[in-house]
Amino acid sequence: AEILMDLSELLEDGNKDLVIIYPGRFHPFHIGHGKVYKYLKQKYSNAKVFISTSGKVDGDRSPFTFEEKRKMMILAGVDSGAIVQTKSPYQSIEIMERFDKDKTVVVFAVSEKDMAEDPRFDFSNGLKLKKNGEPAYLQKWNSLDDAETFGTRGYIATTPTFKFKVRGQEINSASQIRNMIASSDDTMLTQMLQDLYSVTDVPQDIIDLFKNKVGNKETMNENWDEHSFSEFLKENVYEDNIMKKGILTTITEGKSPHKKGTKKYNAHMAAMH
């Protein structure tokens, strides 16, 4: 409660804005994710909370488009204005460039499971250092009092995992959901989606979506699970440079992620100046 009070006072002073980003692949987005969003809104009541996901579609592994995931998010209780399509959710440049890098603190929300499984998230010795002894860009979130704005640093905060059941079975992974859907008939599918979104009336387009993209598959791709924040960092050996340079080059130097000369590039540059 004390931290939350400090947070309110600081935000009212207008010293620093707080932005919380909840990134993920979300294939599919479900009530467990929806509860994380609600938890973040409640815990950081004066912050702007966003859900960041890409529109990348990749066969069985990533079957849903951004618009399809957006529908699932709204069904799970997410405010439509909080949903942002980003090229790389774990950088979320498209969200960050809306804010002033010297007045805004950015926190990425990561699940407890991710934090526990990856040594990169071991902040037990206080400030996380790079090999050269300098502080790393991403640090553990404590409070707004001692937080740097995202021109200098980004933060990671943990979120609890909210358990839920689908047709009496506790859900532990995305693959489990997909395998259950793949082997269900129409009645079972509707019941599963009622549990998956905690609603009594499931819109027909959502039922059709799951039926067409998941229900007609004999077996699901083994790689179907969430691509976690720790996996993102493992894939990027120079993750610290990527996080900071990717975000800051675009925002501070006015460089566009689009190819020079294209309409998108020109529009991006016009928006920057």
Roles of regions detected by a PLM:
Residues 258, 265-273:
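Basic DNA-binding region of bZIP-type proteins
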Residues 2-223, 267:
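Nucleotidyltransferase catalytic core that binds NTPs
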Residues 223-224, 236-238, 254-261:
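Cleaved targeting-peptide boundary
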Residues 1-11, 224-234, 242-248:
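Short linear clamp-binding motif
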Residues 187, 246-249, 259:
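Low-complexity intrinsically disordered segments
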Residues 34-37, 262, 272:
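Alpha-helical and His/Cys-centered functional microenvironments
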Residues 229, 252, 265-268:
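Extended low-complexity, intrinsically disordered segments associated with secretion/export
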